[in-house]
Design a protein with these regions (language model features):
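Cell-envelope/extracellular polymer assembly enzymes that use nucleotide-activated donors
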Residues: 4-7, 37, 189
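Short, well-formed alpha-helical segments that are part of the catalytic scaffolds
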Residues: 15-29
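A conserved acidic beta->alpha catalytic loop
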Residues: 25, 42-51, 93
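Acidic donor-binding/catalytic loop of UDP-sugar-dependent glycosyltransferases
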Residues: 48, 96-109
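Glycine-rich, basic loop-to-helix element that forms the pyrophosphate-binding segment
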Residues: 68-84
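Short aromatic/hydrophobic "clamp" motif used to bind/position activated sugar donors
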Residues: 89
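Flexible acidic/His/Gly-enriched loops in nucleotide-sugar-dependent glycosyltransferase catalytic domains
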Residues: 104-177
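Acidic donor-binding loop at a coil-to-helix junction in glycosyltransferase catalytic cores
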Residues: 183-192
Length: 194
């Protein structure tokens, strides 16, 4: 049914200074490259971001490039959802990177708990350049790997789509989409909707 095991949606907008780091982190993933597609969706960038995307796509088959008129991050992610051909869909902002085994670990966890869960989240380690910052407050709640109920008030604030959630691809026309009317917190609403 699905062509790939994992689809990564990367909204791209005026990010030429850090886009290569993001894309290089995807090339280092331990998941098999034939199980991976990366949708680079340019949202009307005015800098060289689209050119960088095209360069990577020419050299590496995992990258697929799309160019849209500026519509905002939610519309860009929705376009990605509609074009994703992976069993699982994850999101990565163009100024973020993943550790090398992230996608394989997430896909394996989903495989083991497929019937129990709708969404997988994983740790964010904030850096600015080489400087590491304190962990996000949510890690006071998420102390171990496991299955958490997001309807439980204790755990309802642990997700965001910037770079640390993965969802099941339910197939054409069945996936939850982002609310394009929201200027912020669209990711939190999306997670609750999932």
């Amino acid at each position: 049914m699905f062509k790939y095991r994992m689809s990564v949606i990367v909204p791209v907008y005026n990010c030429e200074d850090y886009l290569a780091s993001c894309l290089d982190s995807l090339l280092r993933q331990t998941i098999s490259k034939d199980e991976l597609e990366v949708l680079l969706i340019d949202d009307g960038s005015k800098d060289g971001s689209l050119g960088i995307c095209k360069e990577y796509a020419e050299k590496h088959d995992i990258f697929k490039v799309f160019s849209l008129e500026n519509g905002g991050v939610s519309a860009t992610r929705n376009f990605g959802i509609e074009h994703a051909q992976g069993q699982y869909i994850t999101y990565l902002d163009s100024d973020d990177t993943l550790t090398d085994n992230t996608l394989k670990t997430v896909a394996d966890f989903f495989d083991r708990h497929f019937d129990e869960i709708d969404l997988v989240t994983y740790k964010i380690v904030p850096y600015y350049g080489e400087q590491k910052f304190a962990l996000h407050y949510r890690y006071k709640l998420l102390k171990k790997t496991g299955v958490y109920d997001l309807e439980d008030p204790e755990y309802c604030y642990i997700t965001q789509t910037t770079m640390n959630i993965c969802v099941k691809n339910l197939g054409e026309g069945k996936n939850v989409l982002f609310d394009t009317s929201l200027a912020f917190h669209e990711d939190q609403k999306y997670c609750f909707d999932v």
